[in-house]
């Protein structure tokens, strides 16, 4: 059996909004399509997570003896978001995303290095 760990934000949590923008989890429905005797999935995705939160989760799992054959990583939606209230208050100011591009790249690379060492 292969062990797969999933790290990411709400996209990898299989979270989908309905017409009223209420979020629903669909991971059990998706996983039911795959034979459980071949793949064991541990989903560590968190709603609202950024790449920094992901690195913390990977480091925590590694310290506890992470046993993954594969890891799926997907961050960026929350990292690239902006403080929209600040933008509305001062549209002419220099506004940056929650995570700057270089910080995102370095943090993702650190996450991959932790996983490679496992």
Label every PLM stretch briefly.
Residues 21-22, 48, 52, 102-106:
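Conserved phosphate-coordination/catalytic loops
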Residues 11-12, 49, 77-80:
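Short, solvent-exposed loop/turn segments at secondary-structure junctions
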Residues 1-47, 60-67:
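Serine-esterase "nucleophile elbow" of acetyl-processing enzymes
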Residues 15-16, 52, 82:
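Short N-terminal helix/helix-N-cap motif within the alpha/beta-hydrolase-1
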Residues 56-118:
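Alpha-helical cap/lid subdomain in secreted, periplasmic
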């Amino acid at each position: 059996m292969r062990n797969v760990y999933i790290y990411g934000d709400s996209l990898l949590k299989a979270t989908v909004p309905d017409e009223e923008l209420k979020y629903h989890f669909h991971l059990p429905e998706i996983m039911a399509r795959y034979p459980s005797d071949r793949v064991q999935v541990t989903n560590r995705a968190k709603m609202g997570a950024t790449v920094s939160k992901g690195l913390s989760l990977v480091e925590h799992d590694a310290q506890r003896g992470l046993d993954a054959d594969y890891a799926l990583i997907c961050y960026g939606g929350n990292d690239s978001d902006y403080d929209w209230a600040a933008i509305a208050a001062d549209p002419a100011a220099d506004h940056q995303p929650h995570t700057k591009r270089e910080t995102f790249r370095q943090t993702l690379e650190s996450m991959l290095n932790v996983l490679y060492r496992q």
